[in-house]
Amino acid sequence: MPTGGFKLSSARALAALFLFFSAGSFSRVQAVPQERAAAPAAAERTAQAESSTTTQKDQVDLNVTVYNSNIALIRDVRQLHLASGTFPLRFEDVAASIMPATVHFRSLTDPAKLNVVEQNYEYDLLDAQKLLQKYVGREITLVRGEQDANSTKWVETKALLLADNNNEPVWKIGNEIVTGMPTSWYRFSELPGNLYSRPTLVWTLDNAGAGSQKVEASYLTNNMNWNADYVLTVARDEKTSDLDGWVTLTNNSGASFVNAKLQLVAGEVHQVPPAVRARAEIAGQLSTAMAAPPQFQQEGMSEYHLYTLGRRTTIQNNESKQISLLSGTNVPVEKFLAVEGQSYYYRTQDRIGNPITEPVKLYYRFKNEEKGGLGMPLPAGTVRVYQADSKGGIQFIGEDQIDHTPKDETLKIYVGNAFDIVCERKQLDYKKLANNLYEMEYQITLRNHKDVPVTVEAREPIGGDWEVVNSNLKWTKLDATTISFEIPVEKNGTATLDYRVRVKW
């Protein structure tokens, strides 16, 4: 097999290298201060210095702040030795999903001496098709295999690439124009200077004095997200529970962040929607930590909440990982059952006398308070509920979503529907008393097939200007449009609620 040069198998070319968005670059130009523009001739000569390149190896600090809206703020601090004068700096190992317009570069050592003249984001990334396109008009070595009796002979041919349209190259070999030539791989003499193996930020810097400087590049990137996941384990007697909270962090940004300080922002941060948003759909691996004490410190920040991990962590590209957020034990919890009516019941004559079967919903509620073992702002997320069985095993019984919940607020978790309790609703009467004035009567029947008594809350959403004409059970006005009834049902028994309301629309 021939050696030397830059080789690429044509059969596997498209799979060997990756394609990122489309060819091009993002550029931003800044005026040089007049006093700097009038630099002496010696500095002008320094301006022709070769490009400097910095990679992840130069990092001295890295901060990653992730928002639960699919973005993250990256602050990458590096220690560099910078020449004097005007010169380009290539800043590699940035996220592939970077938002170029958000990039900011500054010197932390001597900001007054270091200025950014021009900023470019280079994303004309190397792949097989682009490499061929860049070599149009240039000579390439074609390598193909010829089979002998017991071996393969590798034959090299010099060819001028005339065109490459739709991955169908046209060659000039000697005095002939050749297409469709079978080739095992191509050999290129060099990598074109305007192709990049990874997304790269390129700054043209104007530096007043040579020396070591600590610089910071900050930018926003898409395709990093976090959400909270909770495990609520309810005791057998359904009076206490344990709540464990986890942060699930997902990184599909196209970069890994090694030994980073991690912070999370909970809250709805407003963003101007872009015309086109690229969405990575990469299935990541899940790295789940074992149960551990909470590792985040919480603080308020404007109208949001900031959670800071108390240690550094590494966030690999295409990875999901979980980190303990909180742990509350012996949290008082209350189980309740409910049937919930619909507001349209009070606007129509709904098949008088015909029963409607409705689910009896199972909820758990608890207060997010310090004396109950909690008392910190809870980010929005999924609560998965478990309960111990008679053998002591833990069984999954349902899940629900919660919104961002401040401390001292009550959470209500919908788990599922009761199996052994049946609810039937009947409209017994519907009358029009006058223009826009109606009166209607409803009956709710509950049949309890359990060996213990239960109490079911019936919540009825009534619109308009309403009043309860009569009811066989006590009722409570919850708000302007909702009344509530507590319906006790004996074990293996039946209970009925009858009530009549008058509504003016």
Please provide the spans of the model-predicted regions.
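Long, intrinsically disordered, low-complexity accessory segments associated with secretion
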Residues: P2, L8, F26-W505
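Bacterial N-terminal signal peptides
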Residues: R12-S25
